């Protein structure tokens, strides 16, 4: 099982993460240079196969469990991913699922949406008790916000959402993100 240290090294070594949201994106990811994939689609019948393809291609695979059809926001979903797939970790917006995943030996990414100043304030409070191995901030095209959040935590920051070109990647990394996730 991949450890936190190796995950952090992979984030630094491969700053662009493939955000896979459909079968076409999966095929593109399998032949890409990206070493990490965030699986943002699937259902309870095909998620193990999607993850297996990524693992066979040598990728680290993280399943966004909030987006898998047929699964609910309960601890049993984390147990299902841990026992029935070869995923390296999970992504979720839910603190309780991240905590449970840590207990199952999975790596974790907690996703936060920065919609307004209140959300930004709440992220600061939540990061103080967050157990995730990394934090994903959406949208990822706000260098000022990324800088503020990365300055308030020792957790690696991943910028995601609305990243559309090289300039967005460079700006996010320069602001303190260790990686970006993009389709």
Q: What are the language-model segments listed below?
A:
Residues 17, 38, 62, 91, ...:
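Conserved beta-strand positions in the central sheet of alpha/beta enzyme cores
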Residues 29, 94, 135, 172:
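Conserved, mostly hydrophobic/aromatic
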